[in-house]
From Swiss-Prot:
Entry similarity comment: Belongs to the acyl coenzyme A hydrolase family.
InterPro entries: Cytosol_ACT (IPR040170), HOTDOG_ACOT (IPR033120), HotDog_dom_sf (IPR029069), Thioestr_dom (IPR006683)
Protein name: Protein VdlD
Keyword annotations: Hydrolase
GO biological process, one term: acyl-CoA metabolic process
GO molecular function, one term: long-chain fatty acyl-CoA hydrolase activity
Organism: Helicobacter pylori (strain ATCC 700392 / 26695)
Any one cellular-component term (Gene Ontology): cytoplasm
Signal peptide interval: none
SUPFAM superfamilies with a match to the protein in the record: Thioesterase/thiol ester dehydrase-isomerase
Top-level taxon of origin: Bacteria
Length: 174
């Protein structure tokens, strides 16, 4: 199967087999219509894109429509200037009965200097829906060390959500 891999191994430890429905790579060029007065991407625009990435990743995985249930801890670490190329690295980290966790890592590349900055990471909980009601998702079994690490991190976050709190801080496993 065709695979996608980056030459920026220190930032982009993400290999995608195009037949693997648990991972997604999407890119977006930051344009002036998405910017605020400081000529950097507006946070709301980024949130909108993150929601779309989570939707595409989860829908592609389960072959059903999905809706956003929650988003955990989006931190805006660095501004994203107009003209930069965003790369969204998304993965299915955990699947329950009708929902899944999608982890997303955002990289911003200055096209002129080729400098890459990890600007954001977050976790979306997406629910599979048919006819307005939650519906079962296909089972997921992590296979690689990275997938197992992400899965275990997702279980911890699920437990924290169940208890009604979620610690902010380092996003593991994206």
């Amino acid at each position: 199967m065709p695979q996608i891999q980056s030459s920026h191994s220190n930032h982009f430890d993400f290999t995608i087999d195009t037949a693997d429905r648990t991972k997604l790579l999407m890119s977006y060029l930051v344009v002036p219509t998405t910017a605020n007065f400081n000529n950097v991407m507006h946070g709301g625009e980024l949130l909108n894109l993150l929601d779309k990435v989570a939707y595409v990743c989860s829908t592609r995985y389960c072959a059903k429509g999905t809706v956003t249930l929650s988003v955990d801890g989006v931190t805006f670490k660095y501004p994203i200037p107009v003209g930069n190329l965003l790369t969204f690295l998304a993965s299915i980290n955990y699947v329950g009965n009708t929902s899944c966790e999608v982890g997303i890592k955002v990289l911003s590349e200055d096209i002129k200097t080729r400098e890459i900055t990890h600007t954001n990471s977050c976790y979306f909980t997406m629910v599979a829906v048919e006819n307005g009601k939650p519906t079962p998702m296909p089972k997921y079994e992590p296979k690689t060390e990275v997938e197992i690490r992400r899965y275990e991190g997702a279980l911890k976050r699920k437990e924290m959500r169940t208890r009604g709190y979620l610690k902010s801080g380092k996003h593991e496993g994206v």
